[in-house]
């Protein structure tokens, strides 16, 4: 398998180009999914259990022709603590459960071949509930074309931590990231069949840049990853446990090569 390095600049302010069908609108169906401008959104309600859309909860994503800029993610879930209900999101690449990835994606990239991997963002969140986080996520796999069985690692960056959910595992580890602002690192080496790690900022970090390569380099130094793993995607969304709220995405740019 030959991997050709790519550089992708996904600019959040670009308008729909001539000939491209507009996806502007409000989407409230479970798992509603659309692609445009190199990004995919998914109204991901993976933990809904027996709750019924429109009766027990609502979950919507509103997009404009400036997509992903101006995207608004909204939700309203019962107050019962039953685990993560949804991770409504925008992403580039291919999730392990996807058949195909997004257009012009730089992924998959093997960690050992990674030269640059950063995420720039500007976000706004609601304050009506504390039952959610705002997080970046990337999946690592042993096979660049693999599905769930190929997953080796789930890496999350919590830009906002609410009262729910809690990171998996513990934070008493040896990770020492040259990363600001202040943060903790959590790890669970036996989470759902793969390793889980999370960088959790101690205060909201909703506008700025995260150097994902710096994080993966540290994980490699610690032996948490070997460097042979493939980065499949980069996701941005809100993990919701309970209550109502919203997330507005003003900017979301991923650079990877």
Predicted segments, located by residue:
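Bacterial Sec-dependent N-terminal signal peptides
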Residues: 6-24
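Short, hydrophobic/proline-enriched secondary-structure or compact coil segments at domain edges
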Residues: 71-75, 117-123, 136-138, 231-240
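Long, compositionally biased interface segments
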Residues: 197, 201-257
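Ser/Thr- (and often Asn-) enriched beta-sheet segments in non-cytosolic proteins
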Residues: 17, 58-64, 72-76, 91, ...
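Aromatic (Trp/Tyr/Phe) and Gly/Pro-enriched flexible surface segments
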Residues: 19-107
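Sec-dependent signal peptide recognition
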Residues: 1-5
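Short helix-loop boundary/capping segments
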Residues: 142-213
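Extracellular-facing segments of soluble proteins and assemblies that are Gly/Ser/Thr-biased and enriched
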Residues: 85-174
């Amino acid at each position: 398998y030959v991997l050709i390095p790519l550089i992708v600049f996904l600019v959040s302010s670009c308008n729909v180009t001539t000939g491209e069908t507009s996806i502007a609108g409000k989407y409230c169906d479970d798992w509603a999914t659309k692609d445009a401008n190199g990004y995919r959104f998914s109204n991901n309600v993976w933990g809904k259990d027996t709750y019924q859309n429109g009766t027990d909860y609502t979950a919507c994503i509103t997009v404009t022709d400036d997509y992903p800029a101006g995207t608004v993610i909204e939700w309203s879930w019962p107050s019962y603590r039953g685990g993560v209900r949804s991770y409504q999101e925008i992403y580039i690449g291919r999730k392990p459960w996807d058949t195909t990835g997004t257009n012009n994606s730089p992924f998959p990239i093997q960690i050992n071949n990674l030269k640059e991997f950063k995420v720039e963002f500007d976000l706004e969140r609601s304050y009506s509930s504390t039952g959610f986080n705002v997080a970046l996520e990337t999946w690592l796999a042993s096979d660049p074309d693999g599905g769930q069985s190929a997953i080796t690692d789930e890496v999350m960056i919590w830009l906002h931590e609410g009262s729910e959910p809690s990171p998996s595992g513990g934070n008493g580890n040896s990770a020492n990231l040259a990363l600001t602002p202040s943060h903790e690192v959590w790890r669970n080496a036996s989470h759902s069949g793969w390793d889980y790690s999370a960088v959790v900022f101690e205060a909201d970090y909703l506008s700025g840049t995260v150097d994902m390569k710096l994080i993966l380099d540290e994980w490699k130094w610690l032996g948490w990853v070997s460097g042979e793993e493939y980065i499949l995607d980069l996701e941005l969304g809100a993990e919701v446990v309970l209550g109502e709220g919203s997330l507005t995405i003003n900017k979301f740019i991923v650079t990877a090569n």
